[in-house]
Amino acid sequence: MTKMSIRGISLNVKVMGKGYPLVLMHGGPGLDHTSLLPLKPLMHQFTLVFYDHRCNGRSEGAEVTSMTMENLTADADALRQLLGFEKWAVFGHSFGGNVALEYALRYPQNLSHLILMDTGGDQWWVNQNAPELLAKRGYSASAVQAARRFYNGQLTPGEFLPTSMKFMSAYYHHFSLLGMAKDFVFGPTPKMRPEALIFGYSKLLKGWTVMDRLGEIKVPTLVIAGRDDFLFPPEHQVALAGGITNAHLEIIERAGHEAPSERPAEIQRVVREFLSAVKADNN
């Protein structure tokens, strides 16, 4: 990774591969780009730009209160300019998809394609619906209450990990604690920032929605989600794709919210086919 000076802060950035540029916006808030590294093989067809949002991961120099949609999207566009790309394709997963939607609305002239992965256009699904869905799926009252506190930013930094572990299995179609432990030991080390999560859910995303503005997005758009995603379930994916002109919807079977790590080969295939088809149509 390289530290790049962007708008007075230091962003943690890694560029790899060759071909048309594709920036990948990670989820959270409070996480980093490592959750999207299973998509690295796309580097054989595209120039991939991984980075940590301000106040997230190993990016430095910004107060957590500066984590606004205005700054998050302006950071991304300044990164595009610094890397010398006239336009790029934008991929956003989870919270990164929220940022990607805002980017598409604020900088429509600077992206050519939009890919939304396990994300949504209205935070109600996370704040209110997700805990209720956990209850319907048989999670304990303690786990449901933990999720409600977590997704509304009602916790301290020290509670971040123990609280999330109470419902961590919900993120996956098939959850393996041993597999997660192996990823932490042998895989890239993620950098978690609990203060960003707390601010994000309690302030930044509180009441956030762009559902009434989806019709403004005109670029070719791909909406992808795991069938078992409890944060943004299939019924919301249908509404999200339906609100964007000519958006294509793909539901991935045997996958939850962490579809990039559960079904990386299938996600890569869908992304390749989407970008190739759009390119062919435009020739």
Placement of each model-derived feature along the sequence:
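Conserved hydrolase catalytic core segment
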Residues: 86-130
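Catalytic active-site module of serine/aspartate enzymes centered on a nucleophile-bearing elbow/loop
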Residues: 247-283
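Alpha/beta-hydrolase
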Residues: 146-212, 219
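Conserved HGGG/HGGXW glycine-rich cap/lid loop of the alpha/beta-hydrolase fold
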Residues: 7-61, 65, 79-80
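Flexible "cap/lid" loop of the alpha/beta hydrolase fold
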Residues: 114-153
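Conserved alpha/beta-hydrolase "acid-adjacent" motif
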Residues: 230-236
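Active-site loop/oxyanion-hole signature of alpha/beta-hydrolase fold enzymes
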Residues: 50-95, 269
